[in-house]
Amino acid sequence: MEELEGHRGEGRLPPPPPLLPFPKVSVQVYTVPSSSTAASAAAAGGARQAVAPATRDGGDGGGRAAGVLDDPVKARIVSHPRYHRLLAAFLDCHKVGCPAEAAEEIAAAARVREARQRAAAAASRMPPAPEDPELDQFMEDYCKLLVECKEELSRPLQEAEEFLRTVESELNSINSGPPLTALISESKAGLDSSDDDEHEDGSGMEMMEAAEDEDLGIIDPRSDDKALKRHLLRKYSGYLGGLRKELSKKRKKGKLPKEARQKLLTWWELHYRWPNPSEMEKIALAESTGLEQKQINNCFINQRKRHWKPTEEMEFAVMEAYHHQSTDAAAAFYVDVDARLVGATAAAPASAVYTARPDHGVWRA
């Protein structure tokens, strides 16, 4: 800048007034047009002096505007067709990261300053400036520089906003999906399953089925990538359907209909002393409840483990009955073997020999 002032030969210019009082805002110009003439150098120096004051609206704005226009180079910059674009690009750099109210104040102050400068230029009745290709090129380059500066300042903020929107969309998709209890396999089976759990699981399945019918899945309506989510849903809908069926099967294993469970409870209360149904009783219970015998077996096994403990008398009676049953079965076996041996000996030829062993049954030699 000192070299530019030396070319002008008019002494040192007063420092430009400060910018608007917003913290951490500083814009400096590091490039000037490549020209060896004093006129182009003066135009570069005048551009810096004319742009910065345009962002401050003090009480003596009219006097400052008139002071700017006292210099013909500054007046030419203010009256240049690209001055409005230059000022807008400069203000855009200041608006990056500012609140909406602060950005509006900056724009309002700039409009007032620009209006005063143009009014002063019109009142001065200066002759139309001749064409200056170097000044035109400088204004164009300076506008491009400010636009690039604004893009560099805005890029981190845009990336941060995009990241926040992505995280918000993922959180909303998680919250709008089925409850977590619908994805956890039931640890308890049989009669201990509560009606509340059934209601929660049913609601989760209804939500998933409705999402598949609408071909939208659990999509956040506020997200910007709806098309991508629809594409992914169409691509992986088969896997999601298979997973839903697997989860449904796992839940059905541990649940019994309310009416069937009540009938089993009634039978349990009537046979509490020995709640072990026979095969005939299991068949009858299966017909009355509509359940499979395997479900009935599991139900009573779990119920006995959790809610029933035989007394000492019952254990003794069970062991005694088992002992008598085993003895009767062995006696019937030997009687049957003897009867068959007697009949076979009368009808068989002399060469046929039958032997009976208690541990191996009947053998023929």
UniProtKB/Swiss-Prot annotation:
<dbReference type="InterPro" id="IPR009057">
    <property type="entry name" value="Homeodomain-like_sf"/>
</dbReference>
<dbReference type="InterPro" id="IPR005541">
    <property type="entry name" value="KNOX2"/>
</dbReference>
<feature type="domain" description="ELK">
    <location>
        <begin position="227"/>
        <end position="247"/>
    </location>
</feature>
<dbReference type="InterPro" id="IPR001356">
    <property type="entry name" value="HD"/>
</dbReference>
<dbReference type="GO" id="GO:0006355">
    <property type="term" value="P:regulation of DNA-templated transcription"/>
</dbReference>
<dbReference type="Pfam" id="PF03789">
    <property type="entry name" value="ELK"/>
</dbReference>
<dbReference type="Pfam" id="PF05920">
    <property type="entry name" value="Homeobox_KN"/>
</dbReference>
<dbReference type="GO" id="GO:0005634">
    <property type="term" value="C:nucleus"/>
</dbReference>
<feature type="DNA-binding region" description="Homeobox; TALE-type">
    <location>
        <begin position="248"/>
        <end position="311"/>
    </location>
</feature>
<dbReference type="Pfam" id="PF03790">
    <property type="entry name" value="KNOX1"/>
</dbReference>
<dbReference type="InterPro" id="IPR005540">
    <property type="entry name" value="KNOX1"/>
</dbReference>
<dbReference type="InterPro" id="IPR050224">
    <property type="entry name" value="TALE_homeobox"/>
</dbReference>
<keyword id="KW-0539">Nucleus</keyword>
<dbReference type="InterPro" id="IPR005539">
    <property type="entry name" value="ELK_dom"/>
</dbReference>
<feature type="region of interest" description="Disordered">
    <location>
        <begin position="1"/>
        <end position="20"/>
    </location>
</feature>
<dbReference type="InterPro" id="IPR008422">
    <property type="entry name" value="KN_HD"/>
</dbReference>
<keyword id="KW-0371">Homeobox</keyword>
<dbReference type="Pfam" id="PF03791">
    <property type="entry name" value="KNOX2"/>
</dbReference>
<dbReference type="GO" id="GO:0003677">
    <property type="term" value="F:DNA binding"/>
</dbReference>
<comment type="function">
    <text>Probable transcription factor that may be involved in shoot formation during embryogenesis.</text>
</comment>
<keyword id="KW-0238">DNA-binding</keyword>
<feature type="compositionally biased region" description="Basic and acidic residues">
    <location>
        <begin position="1"/>
        <end position="11"/>
    </location>
</feature>
<comment type="similarity">
    <text>Belongs to the TALE/KNOX homeobox family.</text>
</comment>
<protein>
    <recommendedName>
        <fullName>Homeobox protein knotted-1-like 7</fullName>
    </recommendedName>
</protein>
